[in-house]
Curated annotation (Swiss-Prot):
CDD domains: homeodomain (cd00086). This is Homeobox-leucine zipper protein ATHB-13. It is found in: Nucleus. Probable transcription factor that may act in the sucrose-signaling pathway. The keyword Transcription applies. Residues 197-210 have a biased composition (Low complexity).
Length: 294
């Protein structure tokens, strides 16, 4: 009984194990056959799959969601392999997809199904590749647009700088012309004032010279302040004698005192003087007395 009770504390294969250890001294008794080693990460992954916590469809779900950071790498354009479980596209598939993208960057459902059947891929893979390709195309397009706009901006900036310098030059020329016009107008005003003053001085000098050089008139004193009668043309051509000059002065004083017919008498007097200067003066006074009494 005691032996049986003592043997109950040991497993049933205890004796067999000891004999097995004697036959195989290199192997130590452990739980290695039952539990795998957890020293490496891939062993942890295997252990998790062994425990049933990772489903076999999890890799396909990761490929189809496309929300992870390595989604673009999973469906990148190159044909290199980064991992055994990542589905990569070969060069022929990439070329075919590039040609279809050049035809149209929008992917229709029918076109997606045709490409998936032709390339042997899932429709979700085709859609993700087109999304990534459109993103890269938009980025390149933005870079091209930025370069074009930057060149245009540089050109416009250079033209603006040239226009600013030209505008400053024109403003400087305008200011110079304004200053020149002001100085010229001032000089012209001074010249006109000087010429006007010179003309007034010259005219006043001329008047003074005329007044100073004019001979005094004796006729006004003889006629009692009245202006002398106008001279006729006959006097210049037929100058009178001294005797006729005295008679003309007396007759002039006589006719100036008369009221009516003074101008007619003066004309007749001048005509008679002209003829008397040429002929004898014997018949002048009787005719004049007869004219007065008439």
């Amino acid at each position: 009984m005691s032996c049986n009770n003592g043997m109950s504390f040991f497993p049933s294969n205890f004796m067999i194990q000891t004999s097995y250890e004697d036959d195989h001294p290199h192997q130590s008794p452990s739980l290695a056959p039952l539990l795998p080693s957890c020293s490496l990460p891939q062993d942890l992954h295997g252990f998790a799959s062994f425990l049933g916590k990772r489903s076999p469809m999890e890799g396909c779900c990761d490929l189809e969601t496309g929300n992870n950071m390595n989604g673009e790498e999973d469906y990148s354009d190159d044909g290199s392999q980064m991992g055994e479980k990542k589905r990569r596209l070969n060069m022929e598939q990439v070329k075919t997809l590039e040609k279809n993208f050049e035809l149209g960057n929008k992917l229709e459902p029918e076109r997606k199904m045709q490409l998936a059947r032709a390339l042997g891929l899932q429709p979700r893979q085709i859609a993700i590749w087109f999304q990534n390709r459109r993103a890269r195309w938009k980025t390149k397009q933005l870079e091209k647009d930025y370069d074009t706009l930057k060149r245009q901006f540089d050109t416009l900036k250079a033209e603006n700088d040239l226009l600013q310098t030209h505008n400053q030059k024109l403003q400087a020329e305008i200011m110079g012309l304004k200053n020149r016009e002001q100085t010229e107008s001032i000089n012209l005003n001074k010249e006109t004032e000087g010429s006007c003053s010179n003309r007034s001085d010259n005219s006043s000098d001329n008047l003074r010279l005329d007044i100073s050089t004019a001979p005094p008139s004796n006729d006004s004193t003889l006629t009692g302040g009245h202006p002398p009668p106008p001279q006729t043309v006959g006097r210049h051509f037929f100058p009178p004698s001294p005797a006729t000059a005295t008679t003309t002065t007396t007759t002039m004083q006589f006719f100036q005192n008369s009221s009516s017919g003074q101008s007619m008498v003066k004309e007749e007097n001048s005509i008679s003087n002209m003829f008397c200067a040429m002929d004898d003066h014997s018949g002048f006074w009787p005719w004049l007395d007869q004219q007065q009494y008439n």
